[in-house]
């Protein structure tokens, strides 16, 4: 079974159509990269997968989004959905609290209070985000004292702490230096063993490095999607080729 199936998805902001008849499948334990010029619908699309667009006034959505075969707009509670489908944003956004409390925040909201259980979740999540060794002696320091790259990995650990199945990443390295970017890319490769990952990126080389599948968006349309090697080296649509070779962007 596909992890996510999207069928005939349309989205309007008021009268403006931002997504047009999107049809796309996401394989389990894979990395799907979404590429395309600014304003093409990539970020709007991933926000339909955890219903973040519900928070915007005047949004109208039609079509179907299935997670494990269930319609997320009809059959799934939105709080449960956002536990299953985590999100990492473009700019690191740690909460103004300790490193420990950042990671424990989600589990506490979901009712976990036992100190030993929380300790285990915090350690496991920080290890999974490749951050434990750097912060294990600073767990009770402010998260805002970490570097930008560490803060982004902390946000990933915070996402992992509620045990999602899918991780959405909206340009997670665009605000980071090259070394921090490399660490996040290595982390993505490791995380896909356990999670399904969808990443929005403006960086074509990054899409080529980290993804198994690539989807090219343009003006709210999904022009083409498929295995990354095919989309990059043997695209079916001239617009895909023009974008990838830098003729526009």
UniProtKB/Swiss-Prot annotation:
Protein name: Phosphate import ATP-binding protein PstB 2
InterPro entries for this protein: AAA+_ATPase, ABC_transporter-like_ATP-bd, ABC_transporter-like_CS, P-loop_NTPase, PstB-like
Enzyme's top EC category: translocase
Binding, ATP: 36-43
Native organism: Caldanaerobacter subterraneus subsp. tengcongensis (strain DSM 15242 / JCM 11007 / NBRC 100824 / MB4) (Thermoanaerobacter tengcongensis)
Membrane topology per record: Peripheral membrane protein
Family, per entry: Belongs to the ABC transporter superfamily. Phosphate importer (TC 3.A.1.7) family.
Alphabetical list of PROSITE patterns matching this protein: ABC_TRANSPORTER_1, ABC_TRANSPORTER_2, PSTB
Subcellular location: Cell membrane
Keyword ATP-binding: yes
Boundaries of every ABC transporter domain copy: 4-244
Principal location listed in the UniProt entry: membrane
């Amino acid at each position: 079974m596909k992890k996510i199936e999207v069928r005939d998805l349309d989205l309007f902001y008021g009268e403006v159509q931002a997504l047009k008849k999107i049809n796309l499948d996401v394989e389990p334990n894979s990395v799907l990269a979404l590429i395309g010029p600014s304003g093409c619908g990539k970020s709007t699309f991933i926000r339909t997968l955890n219903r973040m667009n519900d928070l915007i006034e005047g949004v109208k959505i039609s079509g179907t989004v299935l997670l494990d075969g269930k319609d997320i707009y009809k059959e799934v509670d939105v709080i449960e959905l956002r536990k299953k489908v985590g999100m990492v944003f473009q700019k690191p956004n740690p909460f103004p609290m300790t490193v420990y409390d950042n990671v424990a925040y989600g589990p506490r909201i979901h009712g976990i209070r036992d100190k030993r259980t929380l300790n285990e979740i915090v350690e496991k999540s920080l290890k999974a985000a490749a951050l434990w060794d750097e912060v294990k002696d600073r767990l009770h320091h402010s998260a805002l004292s970490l570097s930008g790259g560490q803060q982004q990995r902390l946000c990933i650990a915070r996402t992992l702490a509620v045990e999602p199945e899918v991780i959405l990443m909206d340009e997670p390295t665009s605000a980071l230096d090259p070394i921090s970017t490399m660490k996040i890319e290595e982390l993505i490769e490791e995380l896909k063993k356990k999670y399904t990952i969808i990443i929005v990126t403006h960086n074509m080389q990054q899409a080529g490095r980290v993804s198994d599948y690539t989807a090219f968006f343009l003006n709210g349309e999904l022009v083409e999607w498929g295995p990354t090697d095919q989309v990059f080296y043997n695209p079916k649509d001239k617009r895909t080729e023009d974008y990838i070779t830098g003729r526009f962007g």
